[in-house]
Amino acid sequence: MKIDYLKNNPREIQLEEDLPPYMTEGVANDIAEIFSTPLSGAYNWDYTVQDNRIKKLYELGKELNWNVEVDVDWSRPFEPLTEPTPIFWDDYAPYQKFSDDKKVEFLNHRIAWSQSQFLHGEQGALLVASQLTSCAPTYNAKLYAASQTFDEARHVEAFNKYIQTRTKLMYPIGNALKSILDKILTDPRWDLKFIGMQIIIEGLALAAFQTSRELTKDPVLRDMLGLIIRDEARHVTFGINYLEEFVETLSEDEKEDRAQFAYEACWLSRERLVSMDVFEHFGWNAEDARQFQLNSDITKHFQKLLFQRVMPNLRRIGLLRDSVVGKFEDLGILEYAEAKSDADIDWADLSRPLFEESA
């Protein structure tokens, strides 16, 4: 065992020749960044099993388990992008100067960057879920958080295998996503971890996974995302149903504090789409490219798809308070708050078999 401890996360891009072997019998060189949190755990001594929605979601999690190595057919060929495709970057002068080969390289790097953020985000979810197992105060919540921890481990495994065996290009975590995860992981308040992860991070991830699944031409990624989406839908539903009741028990000052945190996390999340490392890798003015991307119609449309998932859920749990309404309006995402939330459970949909039975 060899572990290198770093003060900050690595910023290097790992090209195919830089990636470690996906699986090795040799000694792995692990790279670890330490974070500290004044986390207070909680025993639960009555072990009362409430026959409620949380219990049903936990049972579904046990029933709908899947195996990354077995339930995804990895043998299908991978076909990377080989020709430029129409994209909003066509209107950006530095991109216009690229040859077709350079455009293809840029687009493949953008895809790899997005998939890398999925991987890093799922590791963050894994760490938060493990914290919630310890600090959630109720029996059902502990059991569900434990089952979610295993789900998140499976998602990390899936994205890691996909990147290392198919994309073969890995980017470091983006600064915006890292900032959100640092805040959630190091905060001592367990319910803030719930809000940050179950409502915002998981809600945004669910929307992003659904969009990626619709757009990808790779059947392996499509199948993999389909399985991950089933897990994530349960996670978001768990968070809303648990927090809706808990937030009511908080004082007005505590509710205000959580509402401000939710706003700040959403503000940072707008930057999750911006691949600053890719811009810098290709020698662009990163801030100029950032502004171009944020102002593009396709980015605004994608932001809408993402926050249509988050804003109604914040409203449902009582964190869309008067003090933050104007701030959300300035972000341009308040209008999505009246959409349908994920609190109303479609049990038939959540309970569907993972795989269609063959005739």
Which role fits each region the language model picked out?
Residues 126-132, 145-147, 206-212, 224-227, ...:
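A structural feature that tracks compact, well-ordered secondary-structure segments
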Residues 138-168:
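Carboxylate/His-rich catalytic cores and anion/metal-binding grooves
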Residues 139, 143, 219-223, 237:
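Short, solvent-exposed positions on alpha-helices
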Residues 161-233, 257-268:
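Active-site-proximal alpha-helical scaffolds that flank and shape metal-associated catalytic sites
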Residues 243-251:
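C-terminal helix-coil-helix/basic helical segment that borders enzyme active sites and/or dimer interfaces
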